[in-house]
Amino acid sequence: MRHQNKNHKQRPSFLSQFLVILWFRTKLSIRDKKFFILGILLPMISIGASIILNNVLVFGPGSDFQKTNNNLNNNNIFITPKTLNSQQETLINTMKLQYSLNYTYLDDDTDLPNYIENKSLSSLDYGISFIGSNGINIYYNSSIESIPSFVHSFFISLFKINGINLQLNETITVLSSEVTFDAFYLLMPMILQYGFVFFIPYFAILIVTDRDKGFKNHLILNSLRTSVYWFGNLVFDYLIFLIPTIIGWILLYSFKIDGIYSDNSGKSFLLFLTFGISAIPFGFVLQFIFDKEETANKWLYPFTSIVTSIPSALISVAFPTSTPLIVELLLSILPTFSFCNGLKALTYNNSSTVSYTILIQLLSGLIYLILIYFIDNYKKPKKNEIINDEDSESIINNQIIEDNDVLNEKEKIKRLVRDGGGNNNNNKKNNSYPKIVVDGIYKQFIQPKPTLDKPSIIERCSGGTKATKKNSIIKKAVDGIWFSVEKNEIFGLLGPNGSGKSTCLNLLTGLLKADQGDGYLSGKSIDKDKDVFQSIGSCAQNDILFENLTIYEHLYLFSRLKSITTTKSELEDEIDFYINKFSIQSFKNKKSSDLSGGTKRKLSVACCLIGDPQVVLLDEPSTSLDPISRNELHSLIDELKVNKSIIMTTHSINEINQCCNRVAIMVDGKIRCIGTPNHLKHKYGSGYTIDIIPNNYLNNSYEIHNFMAQTFPNATRVERLGRFISYDLPSQNQQSLSTIFRILQSNKQRLQILDFSASSSSLEKVFLKFANLQEEINKQQTNNKSNIINNNNNNNNNNNNNNNNNNNNNNNNNNNNNNNNNTNNNTNNNQLIN
């Protein structure tokens, strides 16, 4: 039994929709292999590499030993300067008494470092350079025991001067080289950074996919709040980020990794947490650069790696211990740089740097959130500046007199809007107002006039020239239409390709923005009210389904987004009702990627209708369905129209006849007729239609035409489609259909007619009349474009010819001038000779 939603006018709360988005993203993620690789595996690999690196580059254990008798005998020692003060002399003499050393005094101006450098390693051991009365420089051989032994002996001698016998124990620990020591502090932050950097493009590409495949708009059109979409994705991505982050930090702390296992361990944990707060919104900002999933997959990973990681690597090499403050501030806008800089500060126990890095990551995260809000609003569809171009008006279009029914509908809508019928408050007070009101919406597309000329460099760099009447072709996709849809009514938009019906639906769903006019859904303005889609069900022409969700999960998602159900059983009843109605029980637990085209279409319509939306927008709902399924769908839509206002675009006359209470036929962006199917059939139908197929068109068509003119004087030849010759008989014709049939049958052999048919005019014939009109308009527009190209080419040729003529004239003038000059010169020469 189906649960009737008593709260269908209300939209679920922010929290309810937020929880649905978390559930939805969880389902998609656990079925995505890329999620486990980039979201879990890579971060854990980087953490494991850091632990291994810390154990491999260990700085010990070395060896401990004691020396009570340091034998420095026979070692060489160089002393400078020669002249020493009394204290310095006493120190040297004491050392002479203690140890049998080979003392060499160098000249006062001797540069001891250079002197030692030029000596062979075997001949030098130690050097002492006295600087003034206080300073002493000690030079020593880099052999492992030289400096401890010499310092040991030096201090024993120093204390001996004061009569103190000093006993020192030496402990020598073998350490790795200085380069190896610094390598860990350089590599560990970079390795951790690279492990976590791929979170950024992975989450960002999911948003690009939503936008490219229409998922985002589809969810919003089906009652999801825009704020819930962004907030839900941000929170879910951050929760996923926390899984490897917390596990990884615990492992790093357990293995006592330098910087993590320290007095700053609390700050190190906060550094990891705040990195996600900054990095995820940063990725969401980057994704606005891309419109296609394929392009984002190709470029976002290397782009993110270069932009965020290369600066960190360069700074780590250029400033291994301390980065200049101005450089840090400039690059801190990049989350991975801040993260790497904070990790480096941890390894050097720089607590203050870690603290302000945490603050920077929090601040940058806030900045990116603000950017997301403004960019998302900026990228929404915009109005075009209306360019009135009389030349773009179709001659055929101008010759058509607007239908009285269309004019009456227009006046009704204008009066309704003027009286406040489109206003939200008035709509609440008076439930009799139409749920859908279209008030003169107008949309034009502007294209540059075709030309063979290449744009200039300036035009290419600036994105082209500004659209004007002279350099543009204006296509009026929707040329000012007015209509309304009442409750419990299905309104059909019928028209050939290019007539503007799909554009009209895109304007009502917010995918396009009207250049003029407005629409109202349940009393809310499409142009002005942000929550206009709070009780909407939308089914696009192409199936917008999530490949990794089952049929049941799709219906669960859209039901939770659109309806308020009090219990789980009510929700189950609602889902089961639509599964049974659409006869898709056997595919209930199948993913949409495994469904046939017809089953996918059924699921799309079911997702649109579930949740009892007040306004339903169906774009060719019976596409891909077989005839039986199509008839079942028509019956189902008619059954479920209670308390709904439905707009349906279609090419099918049968769909109009079976489903629609009223229909509007669109041609070239305008509504040409509007009313019930029967009203249009009687108003525009011509009584009867006769179709004749001659044995030989060339030989028999003239005789057939003369026969029709004599027998049926009011008959009008309409068209020739292949071998068919069609005639319309007006309703004023006095002969019945049976009489017409008998006359044609009796003359069939004489006129050499292969076959014929006679029938009452149908809505299909009415539609074909307007379709022919659309075809003539399209031909005229094509001819106009060809004429524009020819005119441009002729102008270019004329300009070239004029330039050539000017060049020829210039050449002739130059030749004449030269001849005149030669004549004058000859005359002057003759005069000189004479």
Swiss-Prot record:
Sequence positions that bind ATP: G495, P496, N497, G498, S499, G500, K501, S502
SMART domains: AAA (SM00382)
SUPFAM superfamilies tied to this protein: P-loop containing nucleoside triphosphate hydrolases
Domain named ABC transporter: residues: 452-693
Chain intervals with Polar residues compositional bias: 779-789
Molecular function as annotated in GO: ABC-type transporter activity; ATP binding; ATP hydrolysis activity; ATPase-coupled transmembrane transporter activity; lipid transporter activity
GO cellular component: ATP-binding cassette (ABC) transporter complex; intracellular membrane-bounded organelle
Keyword Isomerase belongs to the record: no
Region annotation Disordered: where it falls in the sequence: 779-834
Broad class of the protein's primary localization: membrane
ATP-binding recorded as keyword: yes
Topology in the lipid bilayer: Multi-pass membrane protein
Record family assignment: Belongs to the ABC transporter superfamily. ABCA family.
Annotated protein name in UniProt: ABC transporter A family member 11
Organism, as annotated: Dictyostelium discoideum
Lineage: Eukaryota, Amoebozoa, Evosea, Eumycetozoa, Dictyostelia
Gene name as annotated: abcA11
